[in-house]
Amino acid sequence: YIAQKVGSILEEPQQRGLAHFLEHMAFNGTKNFPGDDKGLGVIPWCETVGIKFGTNLNAYTSIDETVYNISNAPIDRTGVLDSCLLILHDWSNYILLKDDEIDKERGVIREEWRSRNSGMLRVYTDLLPTIYQGDKYADCMPIGSIDVINNFPYKDIRDYYHKWYRPDLQGIVIVGDIDVDTVEAKLKAVFADVQKPVNPAERTYYPVTDNKEPIVAIGTDKEVDDPSIEIYFKQDATPDSEKNNVGYLASQYMTSMISSMLNARLSELVQSANPPFTRASSYYSDFFVAKTKEAFALSASR
């Protein structure tokens, strides 16, 4: 895996959707896997060794992170591990972003945008400005703006890439039956030429404003005929630096127990003669889409 601590939340208004677009471009030509007469692309090379695109080779873009992965690679075969590390290396700083490939991908993204533009997604997107009144999270869905996808100049996606894909915001995760020392040495050698930029932009983690009165958000769409209700009880997110503390782990265990017991009671209600809902659950997680706020949530639907 190569995990980027960046996502659609860091896009400028004219870049809405380009974090996700960039994820697509990572498979359309890199320095060592150009996908032209100079060499195989990432997908064709992976498929020559049995790594199937969509199953063992994939990526996702969310609001605060973007993650690429290669899994079930046959590393017992000579050179496969080295080549997989080279792909991660290229994704980190050497995606080609050629003009013609960008233009070809616009059509792919348009189709994905069309197929994903469901009633539930529209409701979800429409609710964000009410839930996050005035906050950055009010307009941050990774699928972005179709107008931007159709018309953005090439420079905008390159600016996003070179501004945010950099070593201090990246992590490499390797899991498997490997010799740790050998793989670590290979990793350091492969990534030796990837340098942190001078005076990099600050990676801001946008806060969620507290509210004095309850926020009520109602979303409707003609395609959504399964009514549901959710209630969130917000609180500040736990800093990452505290998540290895015994106190935090004990608190998480207690919260998990509370959710389990409450879910058991909700399940009993669902199975009663005349239940008030057909599905219900409780959970503790990020507040809707924001990682800088957490919430205990209850949801129910008919």
Where are these regions (language model features)?
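M16/MPP (pitrilysin/insulinase) zinc-metallopeptidase core fold and M16-derived inactive scaffolds
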Residues: Y1-S71, R122-V123, D139-I143, S260-E294
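M16/insulysin-pitrilysin zinc metalloprotease superfamily fold
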Residues: G29, I70-E105, F287-R302
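Acidic/histidine-enriched alpha-helical segments
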Residues: K38-P44, I95-R114, T125, D179, ...
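Histidine-acidic residue clusters that define the catalytic metal-binding segment
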Residues: Y68-S71, T78, L86, D126-Q170, ...
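Non-catalytic, conformational "gating/processing" segments within enzyme and secreted inhibitor domains
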Residues: R106, M120, Y124, Y154-K188
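An aromatic/glycine/proline-enriched structural segment found at the starts
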Residues: G171-P227
